[in-house]
Amino acid sequence: MFAVSSRRVLPGFTLSLGTSLLFVCLILLLPLSALVMQLAQMSWAQYWEVITNPQVVAAYKVTLLSAFVASIFNGVFGLLMAWILTRYRFPGRTLLDALMDLPFALPTAVAGLTLASLFSVNGFYGEWLAKFDIKVTYTWLGIAVAMAFTSIPFVVRTVQPVLEELGPEYEEAAETLGATRWQSFCKVVLPELSPALVAGVALSFTRSLGEFGAVIFIAGNIAWKTEVTSLMIFVRLQEFDYPAASAIASVILAASLLLLFSINTLQSRFGRRVVGH
């Protein structure tokens, strides 16, 4: 007969929606509109010339390769760390859990300086890696290391709540039915973790695409070799060439939005499939 309205913690729909839209407009849409206004000052030919400049294309390749390697590493290592933090109890677990958020709290410039000193030829890690003829600083590998460090929390914090909700009883039930631990993980746990894991890896990848502070200290910014797109944008801004900087940024922005939209679409379909079952 009559719809019974449940008590809500937040205010009414109109006020909540209005506040949310105001936040979106001021924090998200306003910067994007400024970017579009800068792009409007360029013709299509000028825009194409900027984004297809050989040096810019080389920076795109270095950025994408480094971000891809970093996100894959974070996917594996982040899943392992989330598993350890949720499935085991040991001394120092709380400290280890807190350390997973350190890249969020640490300024990226400080992270870059620290990584550069550790992986330099005379550094703690770099000296050992040099014995195997592996050089990290001033290479794309160093960029990947910096990107992985700054974006690892995205995977850990995305997968960890799902693992906590899943609980070990599902694995135990599978093992009582004759499955090995590896089979129970692959056939029971991993399918449930896949949406969260993919989302975490995607967030790690998109975060890495725009990394600047940690990268510039370990990459060396060698033209055609270790330049990333964020550095190219910074150089254009220093030259007061705002339209060119906006053009380069628009490519990374479009790639990030496309990836995030695809991930959200896949997650929505997965959610509907689970509800349907």
UniProtKB/Swiss-Prot annotation:
GO terms for biological process: sulfate transmembrane transport; thiosulfate transport. Its main location: membrane. The keyword Nucleotide-binding does not apply. The keyword Transport applies. CDD domains: TM_PBP2. Pfam families: BPD_transp_1. GO terms for molecular function: ABC-type sulfate transporter activity. It comes from the Bacteria. It is a multi-pass membrane protein. The chain crosses the membrane at residues 17-37, 64-84, 99-119, 136-156, 185-205, 215-235, 243-263. InterPro entries: CysT_permease (IPR011865), MetI-like (IPR000515), MetI-like_sf (IPR035906), Sulph_transpt2 (IPR005667). Residues 60-263 form the ABC transmembrane type-1 domain. Keywords: Cell inner membrane, Cell membrane, Membrane, Sulfate transport, Transmembrane, Transmembrane helix, Transport. One of its GO terms (cellular component) is membrane. It is found in: Cell inner membrane. Part of the ABC transporter complex CysAWTP (TC 3.A.1.6.1) involved in sulfate/thiosulfate import. Probably responsible for the translocation of the substrate across the membrane. PANTHER family: SULFATE TRANSPORT SYSTEM PERMEASE PROTEIN, SULFATE TRANSPORT SYSTEM PERMEASE PROTEIN CYST. The complex is composed of two ATP-binding proteins (CysA), two transmembrane proteins (CysT and CysW) and a solute-binding protein (CysP). Belongs to the binding-protein-dependent transport system permease family. CysTW subfamily. This is Sulfate transport system permease protein CysT.
